[in-house]
Amino acid sequence: MNRLKEKYQNEIVSSLTEKFNYPSVMAVPKIEKIVVNMGIGDAVQNAKVLDKAVEELQAITGQKPVITKAKKSIAGFKLREGMPIGAKVTLRGERMYDFLDKLVSVSLPRVRDFRGVSKKAFDGRGNYTLGVREQLIFPEIDYDKVDKVRGMDIVIVTTAKTDEEARELLTQVGMPFQK
């Protein structure tokens, strides 16, 4: 079993129950899924760029990404409806815990001038969104093989009802929030 999942079941559930007085163990918020999205605007001109990005996203998450397509045409961006413009991965279960563990303990500390992630990125429903400026912070990405620095959005979806509960859950998981 994953070390983060074990920590959640053995320590975090009891401390959250104590803090927020939940009636049962099932009421304790948990992490439902993590969505990693990479928007690739250059894919409009050059489709090869997309393959490289998909490859990198697969290396980072350990799961094959789904290619996202444009919902509508936008002439200003030379974009037609149905054109591939990005890739996303939805992680659940074991892979989700593996990814979160790696993100918190290895990747985020590798960010330059890192002072912690923003406390303001909660959406009011207990979900947290995090933007990563470069894919190089992940240990699976080889610096020499990178053709272009790409960023990504990481959305952590929890079952928490409020932002306060979600913040407490993520803090105990080890998410380094700003002081």
Curated annotation (Swiss-Prot):
<keyword id="KW-0694">RNA-binding</keyword>
<dbReference type="GO" id="GO:0003735">
    <property type="term" value="F:structural constituent of ribosome"/>
</dbReference>
<dbReference type="GO" id="GO:0000049">
    <property type="term" value="F:tRNA binding"/>
</dbReference>
<dbReference type="InterPro" id="IPR022803">
    <property type="entry name" value="Ribosomal_uL5_dom_sf"/>
</dbReference>
<keyword id="KW-0687">Ribonucleoprotein</keyword>
<keyword id="KW-0689">Ribosomal protein</keyword>
<keyword id="KW-0820">tRNA-binding</keyword>
<dbReference type="Pfam" id="PF00673">
    <property type="entry name" value="Ribosomal_L5_C"/>
</dbReference>
<dbReference type="GO" id="GO:0005840">
    <property type="term" value="C:ribosome"/>
</dbReference>
<comment type="similarity">
    <text>Belongs to the universal ribosomal protein uL5 family.</text>
</comment>
<dbReference type="InterPro" id="IPR031310">
    <property type="entry name" value="Ribosomal_uL5_N"/>
</dbReference>
<keyword id="KW-0699">rRNA-binding</keyword>
<dbReference type="GO" id="GO:0006412">
    <property type="term" value="P:translation"/>
</dbReference>
<dbReference type="InterPro" id="IPR020929">
    <property type="entry name" value="Ribosomal_uL5_CS"/>
</dbReference>
<dbReference type="InterPro" id="IPR020930">
    <property type="entry name" value="Ribosomal_uL5_bac-type"/>
</dbReference>
<dbReference type="GO" id="GO:0019843">
    <property type="term" value="F:rRNA binding"/>
</dbReference>
<dbReference type="InterPro" id="IPR031309">
    <property type="entry name" value="Ribosomal_uL5_C"/>
</dbReference>
<protein>
    <recommendedName>
        <fullName>Large ribosomal subunit protein uL5</fullName>
    </recommendedName>
</protein>
<comment type="subunit">
    <text>Part of the 50S ribosomal subunit; part of the 5S rRNA/L5/L18/L25 subcomplex. Contacts the 5S rRNA and the P site tRNA. Forms a bridge to the 30S subunit in the 70S ribosome.</text>
</comment>
<dbReference type="InterPro" id="IPR002132">
    <property type="entry name" value="Ribosomal_uL5"/>
</dbReference>
<comment type="function">
    <text>This is one of the proteins that bind and probably mediate the attachment of the 5S RNA into the large ribosomal subunit, where it forms part of the central protuberance. In the 70S ribosome it contacts protein S13 of the 30S subunit (bridge B1b), connecting the 2 subunits; this bridge is implicated in subunit movement. Contacts the P site tRNA; the 5S rRNA and some of its associated proteins might help stabilize positioning of ribosome-bound tRNAs.</text>
</comment>
<dbReference type="GO" id="GO:1990904">
    <property type="term" value="C:ribonucleoprotein complex"/>
</dbReference>
<dbReference type="Pfam" id="PF00281">
    <property type="entry name" value="Ribosomal_L5"/>
</dbReference>
